[in-house]
Regions:
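Alpha-helical transmembrane segments of multi-pass membrane proteins
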Residues: 74-94, 109-120, 139-140, 277-295, ...
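Soluble-to-membrane junctions at the N-terminal ends of transmembrane alpha-helices
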Residues: 54-86, 128, 218-227, 258-285, ...
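Membrane-embedded transport module
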Residues: 290, 294, 321, 330, ...
Length: 888
């Protein structure tokens, strides 16, 4: 047993360990990893788990609470407050006489720092906890051989979570599996593995139990014949292997360490960054001007400097990251309650922006419960003697690869008829696995008399290319053109009824070889057909209708026969008038392909790479493309799409490639996801437009006040408190509702619209800020230093209330409070902040920061100014919508 951690460290990833695992004889490898040919005991697994930890890759560094707290503290807002605390300490405590020391400002500002930091930390912490919880709801599994503590002989085939694997485990691999750890192959059968995630090469390569001489001294370690690395996936075939590295000790884990935390920026990230930079650019231009104007007109450069810094804080969108995170996190939690798991938070926004959904047919539009309806002879007569069924059963039963839905249907049908004993008279000799180029698979069987035959089933057109004969009425005849035509007519009839048809062929062998290859699939005898029915989901038609109503076009991308795809598509309400097949696409020019993918809704007989290519072509036309699929052949398309959607029962590689996982195969959740994505995006846009327009207007207000007033319009502490209160009022935006009209179509970032919005709406607040200046100057005679605090109190309240009211004005294109009201959290928070803002000048806290109670005659003026502000904003909103055809 492994008693010392130093014995474990040598298992960390390094080239020597990999080469040892590859080159050493099996017995040596078993001894080195202290395991047996039956696997590990449960006790040993527990020990190794405690030493190694879970078998997981940290794609992004987990954020520790202390680090998150530090990041919440390090931001422009807290930075300026900290500077103000230091200055206050120097001016009010250190340089003051003992009797004149004043700690009030220090205590107040320090309280603001603590509140601001905690607010951001809590939101970030909750978002991370939610994301981690959602990730745990989707698990990939593998089959492992383990030696029970009370049994002998092992228990092969136990399904466990990939996280529970430890070095020394023996695992079973089959088509569709993600390689769960770094593995030395000890047994294999036609094992083809895709290493594209590691090497970038799209072609799959074959792996063997033994290392070839050519690989002994040359080549990259990823090319080793008997080593499979975590992150690659099984395309076809099967294998047994011993795990020699897990988690961060794997080859993939080493790569992940170097890139952890450096996720590539998405269009969504870039949009947020553009908004932030736009606001910061305005701030960098205006703040120096404010500093110079105040310094020149007031003569106090230190005060002007502190005021300019405070203005900078007010103009900095410091809450934007928190609002975005809170919105996305809330959207993910809402979707999880609807049986939809979000692996990547940014995918929620893409869900809302999606205007084209490409979907596979089988298991997505259909029920994923295929039934074998008919098994018929070549001449179309029923297979009353079950000869066709028997051959189909052998093919499905003896294959070791991934049994697809049609294999399961055959096995289930034979079980219903009580014919499972058919296989007892035969033994398997070899198999030629399925691949998406040949679109067929073969097994070689031998009966008790030593007679061998190869049995092949696959897509009809591909099967006809390897058949030279056909069996009619028990007699084998050359396969003539008329017979081929008859076969194709029969298939079309079945396809028109929505049935999928496979052809079945066989050939007897005298050879006693034990290894067979694709070259043996020739001169075969066509013996019959299998017709399967996979009816559409009950929810498919309604879901597609609702997606269309919400501006999402649905396209079907299938590897199946064109007639079958059209039949199913018609039943679920998809337009089938324009369609194209994979072979037709191959022969098109790039320009013709581009036109075809835009025009057509039905794509059939596609290869996996063609699915991916179609998505790329659609994206080039500025579409946001989603893809829904659950098979091995869907993995490339899932990765290529803007939002990959799969189901919890999908093969590992499909789940790994997806951004969204549906826990139930109910297409109605797609509509929920689209709407939640648009709500999330809409609420983010609300904050962005509120902040942008408010900040843009405040720049002009501050500049005007700085130029014409003999004193500061507000003290730095006033600006900071006002900014903090406004920020708090925005924290409920993620819980706001969106108007139904906004949710009716896809939404994407538009930086040009944001600039227009700022220019149109921003200056409105400046008009009424200046009106407030005039009221305070002329009506309340705030024209000298003795009335400075009254002036500042008047603008403090008006500025805060107008900023908070704009939340309700901007959140909807309708008339606020009358035609559209905010959610109760938004209403409660905004009006509470407004009440707090009005009360502050009347409190001792207000006095401590230089504010003074306002005369009651001020408030009618305030109401008039705010009402006028709302009316003018609503009028300009209507005009803006009429000119630019949009609001949010």
């Amino acid at each position: 047993m492994w008693k010392k951690k130093k014995n474990i460290r040598k298992m960390a990833f390094n080239t020597e360990t990999v080469l040892m695992a590859a080159k050493a004889p099996l017995n040596t490898v078993l001894t080195y990893f202290q395991t047996t040919s039956f696997g590990l005991t449960d006790e040993e697994v527990e020990k190794r788990l405690s030493l190694y930890g879970k078998n997981e890759i940290v794609h992004e560094q987990k954020k520790k609470p202390l680090v998150m707290l530090a990041k919440a503290f390090i931001n422009p807002f807290v930075g300026v407050l900290t500077v103000l605390v230091a200055i206050s300490y120097v001016m009010d405590v250190w340089m003051a006489d003992p009797g004149d020391q004043d700690w009030t400002s220090i205590i107040v500002v320090s309280t603001m720092i603590i509140l601001s930091t905690i607010l951001r930390f809590v939101q970030e912490w909750k978002a991370n906890r939610s994301s981690e919880a959602l990730q745990k709801m989707v698990t990939n599994t593998c089959y492992v051989m383990r030696l029970g503590t009370s049994t002998r002989g092992g228990s092969p085939g136990d399904e466990i979570s990939n996280e529970e694997l430890v070095p020394g485990d023996l695992i079973m691999l089959s088509a569709g599996d993600m390689i769960p750890a770094d593995v030395r192959i000890i047994e294999s059968k036609d094992l083809f593995v895709s290493q594209s995630s590691l090497t970038g090469e799209s072609d799959s390569i074959e792996k063997f139990p033994n290392l070839s001489e050519a690989r002994n001294h040359t080549g990259s370690i990823v090319d080793l014949d008997n080593i499979c690395f975590m992150g690659s996936n099984v395309v076809s075939g099967s294998a047994k292997g011993i795990v020699f590295a897990t988690g961060s000790h794997t080859y993939l884990g080493t790569i992940a360490k170097n890139v952890a935390g450096h996720r590539a920026a998405t269009a969504f990230d870039k949009g947020i960054t553009k908004v932030s930079l736009l606001l910061i650019r305005f701030m960098l231009i205006m703040v120096p001007i404010v500093f110079l104007v105040n310094g020149i007109t007031k003569g106090d450069w230190l005060e002007a400097f502190i005021f300019a810094i405070s203005v900078a804080v007010g103009l900095t969108p410091e809450m934007l990251p928190m609002i975005v995170t809170a919105n996305l996190s809330k959207g993910a939690m809402v979707m999880s309650r609807k049986k939809t798991i979000v692996k990547d938070l940014n995918a929620i926004q893409n869900f809302g922006a999606m205007n084209i959904l490409c979907t596979d047919k089988t298991g997505t539009l259909t029920q994923d419960h295929i039934v074998l309806e008919r098994h018929v002879n070549v001449d179309g007569t029923e297979d009353k003697e079950n000869r066709i069924l028997r051959h189909a059963y052998f093919n499905s039963y003896f294959q070791t690869g991934l049994k697809n839905l049609m294999d399961r249907a055959i096995l289930s049908h034979v079980k219903e008829l009580g014919l499972e004993s058919l296989s007892s008279s035969y033994k398997k000799v070899d198999e030629i696995p399925f691949d998406f180029t040949r679109r067929r698979m073969s097994v070689v069987v031998e009966d008790r008399n030593g007679k061998r035959q190869i049995i092949t089933k696959g897509a009809v057109e591909e099967m006809l290319t390897v058949c030279s004969f056909a069996e009619f009425g028990g007699k084998v005849q050359p396969l003539s053109d008329s017979m081929r035509s008859k076969a194709q007519r029969f298939v079309k009839e079945m396809n028109a009824q929505g049935m999928r048809v496979l052809a079945l062929a066989q050939k007897s062998f005298l050879s006693k070889e034990n290894n067979f290859a694709i070259e043996d699939e020739k001169e075969m005898v066509l013996i019959g057909y299998l017709a399967f029915l996979d009816p559409p989901k009950e929810s498919a038609s309604q879901a597609i209708k609702q997606l269309h109503e919400h501006g999402v076009e649905v396209k079907v991308l299938s590897g199946d026969n064109e007639a079958v795809v059209k039949a199913i598509s018609r039943q679920v309400g998809i337009n089938t008038s324009d369609s194209v097949t994979g072979p037709e696409l191959e022969n098109m020019s790039q320009e013709a392909k581009q036109k075809a993918v835009v025009k057509c809704s039905i794509f059939s007989k596609l290869t996996p790479m063609q699915k991916s290519e179609i998505i790329q072509l659609l994206q080039k036309k500025n579409n946001t493309v989603g893809f829904l699929g659950d098979g091995i052949n869907d993995a490339a398309a899932l990765r290529e799409s803007d939002i990959g959607i799969s189901v919890d029962s999908a093969v590992d590689i499909a789940k790994e490639s997806a951004d969204i996982i549906l826990l139930e195969k109910d297409l109605m959740v797609l509509e929920n996801g689209v709407l939640e994505g648009r709500k999330t995006f809409g609420n983010i846009v609300k904050y962005v437009k509120m902040t942008a327009s408010s900040n843009f207007g405040n720049m002009f207000s501050v500049l005007a006040a700085s130029a014409f007033l003999p004193f500061l319009p507000m003290l730095p502490i006033h600006l900071l408190i006002q900014n903090l209160l406004y920020d708090i009022s925005q924290t409920t935006i993620p819980f706001d509702r969106m108007d139904r009209e906004y949710l009716a179509k896809p939404r994407v970032w538009d930086s040009g619209d944001l600039s227009r919005f700022m220019i149109w709406i921003g200056p409105i607040s400046s008009i009424f800020d200046i009106a407030t200046y005039m009221v305070m100057w002329w009506v309340f005679k705030c024209q000298g230093p003795d009335m400075e605090s009254l002036f500042q109190s008047g603008w403090f309240i008006e500025g805060l209330l107008s900023q908070t009211l704009i939340v309700h004005m901007i959140r909807t294109r309708k008339v606020p409070f009358i035609q559209s009201s905010a959610s109760w959290p938004v209403m409660l928070m905004t009006f509470s902040i407004m009440a707090v803002g009005i009360c502050i000048p009347f409190t001792s806290f207000g006095s401590s920061i230089g504010l003074t109670p306002l005369p009651w005659t001020y408030f009618p003026w305030l109401v008039g100014i705010l009402l006028s502000y709302c009316v003018l904003t609503q009028w300009l909103k209507t005009l803006y919508i009429r000119v630019f055809k949009r609001w949010l």
